[in-house]
Amino acid sequence: MWTVQNRESLGLLSFPVMVAMVCCAHSSNEPSNMSYVKETVDRLLKGYDIRLRPDFGGPPVDVGMRIDVASIDMVSEVNMDYTLTMYFQQSWKDKRLSYSGIPLNLTLDNRVADQLWVPDTYFLNDKKSFVHGVTVKNRMIRLHPDGTVLYGLRITTTAACMMDLRRYPLDEQNCTLEIESYGYTTDDIEFYWNGGEGAVTGVNKIELPQFSIVDYKMVSKKVEFTTGAYPRLSLSFRLKRNIGYFILQTYMPSTLITILSWVSFWINYDASAARVALGITTVLTMTTISTHLRETLPKIPYVKAIDIYLMGCFVFVFLALLEYAFVNYIFFGKGPQKKGASKQDQSANEKNRLEMNKVQVDAHGNILLSTLEIRNETSGSEVLTGVSDPKATMYSYDSASIQYRKPLSSREGFGRGLDRHGVPGKGRIRRRASQLKVKIPDLTDVNSIDKWSRMFFPITFSLFNVVYWLYYVH
């Protein structure tokens, strides 16, 4: 029993030992050990001249490009640029770096890249770029046995993107990344997208706050300069702006403020303070929205789509304020002459009101009338020459002081006394009617202006919105 258990334990212990012995033997015979790799790398770098391109004097070097887009951090309309973070990989074949005896790829320290020839690639529309350096410089160099070199970088670049903002914010923009050789012409180097359509990855995973990436396109071409023809690769992003932010921040507030300005049509026309305050407030609010929007956009010479909408809202708000100015002009007077005449009438009325309380009595107790008072009590062609009833009680008054809202009882008694003695009262009634006709405006016209405005403004503003959105959306 013990012997069987001992043998089983021995067998279990001997298996790992045998595996370790096999592994050690294999490791000792493995050519890819540290010393052999070190010798291989030293041999490759010994006598290597980074000043000369691969196959110098022969055919051009084919450099393949691959891009893995990590993020598009910002798209700025003010600066006309966008910021892109990517993993940028270049690959080419350098026969001077081929090796044998090691069936493995050699991934070396990033500092080895400073000892090897690399393409003089640059971004044509670059404004500011940098290679990330945390915690070490984000570079990769990998050698293949056939001499293929893979060179990778993690780069953040801010590239120029010229935008057409005529349809802003209902626009689509094309932002490109131009990759070109700075010094080598097509006689020395050629660029191509390594992997065809799969050369660019990660685009579908990108999410932007104000844009959606509709499509992207890769282009390979040659450009001619005075110094020769140079290879160029272009990666173009088609960005469609999301309208949701602008509806909440610009379109909806502007629409509500325009509708708010129409409230004045339902306010009584003699409430000047309320209607003027409402009109001025809405005008200033629209001005503030327009000013804030201009600060977030470049100073461009053409009119944008959002400018047209804001100007339309501003016109409707301003016309609502002018509508009350027109109503006020009709209701309270037709020009400065009317205002001057009303002031003179007011001062004359005050003077005559004071004189109405004065009564002149002769020695017999009769009330006397002055020449002006006699003229005021007669019609155009009829002249009062005397008073038939010396006991009649008369008060001096002026026709200019007739108040149609608060008639004096003493004047009515005096009028009846004159009518009783044969002095006609129809002329006086006609004078009062003519004065009432001049002083009281036609309230029906004022009400009709507000009434028609309540229908005209909403209908025209709705038509403006229909035309605007149909034109710019489709």
Curated annotation (Swiss-Prot):
Residues 328-451 are cytoplasmic. The keyword Zinc-finger does not apply. It comes from the Eukaryota. Pfam families: Neur_chan_LBD, Neur_chan_memb. 4-aminobutanoate binds at residues 182, 227. Belongs to the ligand-gated ion channel (TC 1.A.9) family. Gamma-aminobutyric acid receptor (TC 1.A.9.5) subfamily. GABRB1 sub-subfamily. This is Gamma-aminobutyric acid receptor subunit beta-1.
